[in-house]
Amino acid sequence: MALTKAEMSEHLFEKLGLSKRDAKDLVELFFEEVRRALENGEQVKLSGFGNFDLRDKNQRPGRNPKTGEDIPITARRVVTFRPGQKLKSRVENASPKE
């Protein structure tokens, strides 16, 4: 099961007493700020959670798996996430759910 933005909004509504509209807007605003920062080439640091970084990948050789033809994989910028120590610790110590 995955946590969705709608579920995050519902949690804010229940825990903080925000209106459903305000809770939804808060979640959307948070993710929009993360997107904006990354689009502007900034690192996003969320204390106690982790860091979103941008990494430039160089062009490299690749192969079409269907035809075996050699094709170049173009250079691109990717987003990476490095979890913080607190998040790592909580995940490692959590009991698995089935």
UniProtKB/Swiss-Prot annotation:
Heterodimer of an alpha and a beta chain. Transmembrane segments: none annotated. GO terms for cellular component: cytosol. GO terms for molecular function: DNA binding; structural constituent of chromatin. Keywords: DNA recombination, DNA-binding, Transcription, Transcription regulation, Translation regulation. One of its GO terms (biological process) is regulation of DNA-templated transcription. SUPFAM superfamilies: IHF-like DNA-binding proteins (SSF47729). Gene3D superfamilies: IHF-like DNA-binding proteins. The gene is ihfA. InterPro entries: Hist_DNA-bd, Histone-like_DNA-bd_CS, IHF-like_DNA-bd_dom_sf, IHF_alpha. It comes from the Bacteria. Belongs to the bacterial histone-like protein family. This is Integration host factor subunit alpha. It comes from Serratia proteamaculans (strain 568).
